[in-house]
Amino acid sequence: MSQRTVTRRYAAALYEEANANGVLEAVDEDVRMLLESLDSNRPLVRVFESPVIPQDKKDSIVRELLGDRVEDLTVRFLRLLIRKDRETMTEAILDQYQTLRDEQRGIVDAEVTVARPLADETRTTLVGVLEEKTGKEIRLHLHEDADLIGGLVVRIGDRVFDASVRSQLGALHDRLREATLSENALDDGA
């Protein structure tokens, strides 16, 4: 079974249990906190990923660190990951959980690359256009890349819309090359 399939299954199981037990909002907050902790505390990640640290030690670390701070379901879920030897996938599973929750709420991430910073008004307009096109709430992530020259590239999920000057110049270059090759072929044939 692929890692992606495993992360989706565990994330969906956590969501379903949290929903069934009426603790969805609490688990959402736990997941946010855990992801922030894992991101800022690389030694903790190394503990989870270490094959030399026994499962019972990892289990007691989870209980000691999180026991009273998070929802009981969250602790039980993390302990399950340890028992099933899936603790190395914790971060990916929690990320997938957040993606699943965003889908449930109708929120999508839009990765937008621009040549230079956007004015606030332009950013607001862009979000409005993207929300209208997708029918979903947009969470905008802006990146700058001067190589684009101008325009922008938008990635939402697997879809990419490239309206950069760089790509337009590349397309123009390809058309000119084809026209030149066609013209040369005609000249050679005459």
Curated annotation (Swiss-Prot):
<comment type="subunit">
    <text>F-type ATPases have 2 components, F(1) - the catalytic core - and F(0) - the membrane proton channel. F(1) has five subunits: alpha(3), beta(3), gamma(1), delta(1), epsilon(1). F(0) has three main subunits: a(1), b(2) and c(10-14). The alpha and beta chains form an alternating ring which encloses part of the gamma chain. F(1) is attached to F(0) by a central stalk formed by the gamma and epsilon chains, while a peripheral stalk is formed by the delta and b chains.</text>
</comment>
<keyword id="KW-0375">Hydrogen ion transport</keyword>
<keyword id="KW-0139">CF(1)</keyword>
<keyword id="KW-0997">Cell inner membrane</keyword>
<keyword id="KW-1003">Cell membrane</keyword>
<dbReference type="InterPro" id="IPR026015">
    <property type="entry name" value="ATP_synth_OSCP/delta_N_sf"/>
</dbReference>
<dbReference type="Pfam" id="PF00213">
    <property type="entry name" value="OSCP"/>
</dbReference>
<keyword id="KW-0813">Transport</keyword>
<dbReference type="GO" id="GO:0046933">
    <property type="term" value="F:proton-transporting ATP synthase activity, rotational mechanism"/>
</dbReference>
<comment type="function">
    <text>This protein is part of the stalk that links CF(0) to CF(1). It either transmits conformational changes from CF(0) to CF(1) or is implicated in proton conduction.</text>
</comment>
<dbReference type="InterPro" id="IPR000711">
    <property type="entry name" value="ATPase_OSCP/dsu"/>
</dbReference>
<protein>
    <recommendedName>
        <fullName>ATP synthase subunit delta</fullName>
    </recommendedName>
</protein>
<dbReference type="GO" id="GO:0045259">
    <property type="term" value="C:proton-transporting ATP synthase complex"/>
</dbReference>
<comment type="similarity">
    <text>Belongs to the ATPase delta chain family.</text>
</comment>
<dbReference type="GO" id="GO:0005886">
    <property type="term" value="C:plasma membrane"/>
</dbReference>
<keyword id="KW-0066">ATP synthesis</keyword>
<keyword id="KW-0472">Membrane</keyword>
<comment type="function">
    <text>F(1)F(0) ATP synthase produces ATP from ADP in the presence of a proton or sodium gradient. F-type ATPases consist of two structural domains, F(1) containing the extramembraneous catalytic core and F(0) containing the membrane proton channel, linked together by a central stalk and a peripheral stalk. During catalysis, ATP synthesis in the catalytic domain of F(1) is coupled via a rotary mechanism of the central stalk subunits to proton translocation.</text>
</comment>
<keyword id="KW-0406">Ion transport</keyword>
